[in-house]
Amino acid sequence: TATVNSLWRDIKVYQNHAYIVSEAYEHGMQVFDLTRLRDVESMPVEFIADVNFKDFGRAHNIVINEESGYAYPVGNQDSGRNFVRCENEGGLFDGGPIFVNIQTPNVPFIEGGYEGSGYTHDAQVVTYNGPDNDYIGKEIFVGSNENSIDIVDITNKSKPQLISNIDYNNVSYTHQGWFTEDFKYFIVGDELDELSFGGNTRTLIFDLTDLDNPVFSFEYFGPTPAIDHNGYTVGNSYYLANYRAGMREIDISQIESKQINEVRFFDTYPENDNPNFT
């Protein structure tokens, strides 16, 4: 850690460099050159970061778009140090994404940010190549913002533009979401709905054929009442991590007809599948 211990830490990799954020106070972003691991001759070895980037404080997550060479720390809760244009009590850019240029991996610098939606818990950033021709080639941010989802064009780092906002029924904590590989659908997990409303693990699917006009498509309910956490798509599969029900693989090949089904799972907490944190 760059400062103190914390339960929350996130790491993403770009060009053989690990970018590390944490909710530890004043942590900023550590940059570590992973190629240093190739020359280890005797273990154990305690490494220090190559860069301790302190232009923002704590953050819950970090997102990287490898195509553009930008990192996006989200969930910042401390005021910034050097990039003060949007400082406020809620953190740099009010806890929204910070636009960090990492095209030279060990020389990060902030180019801007987006504060229009307040705190962002997690996000996906893509160079868009989907069905909406208005945004082909644009850099699109989709943020899970606790009680809604925001879609933002962040191509121009000094002038991000909100495209649309998504609300849905029985919202409790909009935690994380991910595009299908064709960018047509966005699959969302609400972390606390099982605790708040009961029922089995709920996954929400939105049709994003038109980014300006997202449409709720359908809900999928898993076989257990466990709390869901993060989910990612690979091809025709959606891999969903759950607190007490392990990793579930869901076949999404028939998502167009609103038919998705679990095909296998790996249980990491065999004691029970209750809607509790572990």
Regions found by a protein language model. Give the residues of each.
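Feature marking well-ordered beta-strand scaffolds used for ligand recognition
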Residues: 1-278
